Amino acid sequence: MNTAIIYVGAAIAEIAGCFAFWGWLRLGKPVWWLAPGLLSLALFAYLLTLVESEAAGRAYAAYGGIYIVASLAWLWSVEGVRPDRWDVSGACVCLAGAAIILWGPRG
């Protein structure tokens, strides 16, 4: 499976799972919100195991850039807060770092 697709799926699963906890603790949502949150976090962890990488830490580090961009998309689409120029600039820097980690020459 394509690494980018796995990372995007993992990001959505992680953000949704964490938001379920946020909703319960910060927004007063019912405790049953934790059940889909836990399932979503388990899916996130599973998806990261599908990434072709010799080292887990490298897979997680590269994923970080995708997570940040997905978090800003969530901020805008779910929470209704438009990312500002600093959010976008920071995300671009993180994506550049993720690209270096993913595709940098090894050896």
From Swiss-Prot:
Protein species of origin: Rhodopseudomonas palustris (strain HaA2)
Transmembrane segments: 5-25, 31-51, 61-81, 85-105
SS bond list: none
Keyword line: Cell inner membrane, Cell membrane, Membrane, Transmembrane, Transmembrane helix
GO cellular component, one term: plasma membrane
Entry similarity comment: Belongs to the UPF0060 family.
Major place of residence: membrane
InterPro entries cross-referenced by the UniProt entry: UPF0060
Name of the protein this chain belongs to: UPF0060 membrane protein RPB_2370
Membrane topology, record value: Multi-pass membrane protein
Keyword check for rRNA-binding: no
